[in-house]
Amino acid sequence: MVGPEGTKRISKIDTYLNVAEAFAYRSTCIKRKYGAVIVKDDVVISTGYNGSPRGYDNCCDLGVCPRIQLGMHQGEGYGLCRAIHAEQNALLNCSREQTIGADLYLAGINPGDNSIHRAKPCPLCSRLIIQAGIQNVYLRVGAKAGEYEVCLLYTSP
């Protein structure tokens, strides 16, 4: 997680990306861990991480991922994945009225070494984010303060 340098205060963007990163560690996925935070007017209104639907077996508990077994890469075989994406979970936990004009913060973690994974919403999540009225999407792209991007959403593969 990003921390302040010396006596400086951490930026709001890095603060919310830290929250997203913390939620990524709650992920039940063994391929990649993602966390998302939705913020409006400097208030956290929702959080989410990628994992199986409530009440279903988690891949981390089963010790198996169908996409890993088939050698699939990022962006491939989403239909085989049992997880709900972090962005989807965050959006499901609040109303559209709350999300209009809000910002979404997304962080990804590689499970093997806990390094930062350059996260980006998939086409389906992009459409959901647009439909929810989210204003900006911030992506953690590095382990240092200020290492983030504002995402331009895409809606087709």
Residue ranges and their predicted role:
Residues G112-D113, R118, R127-Q131, Q135-V150:
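C-terminal binding/interaction regions
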Residues S11-R32:
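Short, basic/aromatic recognition patches
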